[in-house]
Amino acid sequence: MRILVTFAVEAEFAPWRKRHGFTRIEIGIPQRNTNQTSYEVYEANVAETDVDVLLTGIGWEDLFHNVAHKALRDLLKRKPDCCVSTGLAGGLNREFRSGNIVAASQLILREGGGMILSNKKLLKVAESCGAKVADTLITERHIVSEASSKSAMSKFGDFVDMESYHILQVVSGTQIPAIAVRGISDAVDRDVPLDFNKVLDHDGTVRKRRLIEEIIRNPLRIPSIIRFGLQSSQASRAVADFLVKFVSSLANYDGRVAASAYGEVAAR
């Protein structure tokens, strides 16, 4: 069995990576209109399952320059039995607290567009492994930092990220079963203490000068920044714990997880 797992950045992947012997593979990109000439894939055998991990970066860049889109399409040619979009997300539903693992029944874009569904069998497996199943995951263009903004968005969804809709949209054209499962880093009633849109690069690298400037501008936020960092680390470890159970559970299935439900992961 083979599965494809996507995270946005290394920090989200790190707790799971440490538990298994993932090998980093660099794959070249021929004739691309971008400064990036390759992408990295991490490979391991987990619970008798071949696992490919792709780090997509934060958000989803313009398609013309989107290396993650190219990499995802390449990895789907390996015919994985399913695809999992995971990592961290912000909570919109008051029932979800930091560290909760939440799976999305459906995904929408903040700016509108068609709805995408997670695979029903994968949702059942995720729930059996401890995930809470929510109605709607919203994919946004930027990190939603303010509690007031999250509260306003809660009318339309239960949690928010920046990648999952785009990932499942690409996968939907292949009829490979897919699911979005995220760890909650910040609850709906909590401000994110920094504007991470300013201090993080696309690959998750911290812009140290910007970070220092933000801290100097708001020194009273230092305790909140530390607390948020600890919560994010806890949520990433919770994702790793979930994936251990999830991959082991998938290994109990023969053939494709959704052999009887190929049309479920589709935009409508």
Name each model feature, range by range.
Residues 261-268:
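Acidic, Ser/Thr-rich low-complexity intrinsically disordered segments
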Residues 56, 181, 228:
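Glycine- and other small-residue-rich loops at beta-strand/loop junctions that grip anionic moieties
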Residues 116-200:
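Active-site rim beta-loop-alpha module in soluble metabolic enzymes
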Residues 184-260:
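Regulatory input/activation interfaces that engage signals or partners
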Residues 1-125, 133, 158, 173:
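Metabolite-binding pocket within alpha/beta catalytic cores that recognizes anionic/polar moieties
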Residues 15, 74, 125, 170, ...:
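Alpha-helical scaffold segments in soluble metabolic enzymes
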Residues 7-8, 83-87, 178-188, 247-250:
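Glycine-rich anion-binding loop/nest that anchors nucleotide
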Residues 7-11, 62, 66-67, 117, ...:
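Conserved active-site and cofactor/substrate-binding residues in soluble primary-metabolism enzymes
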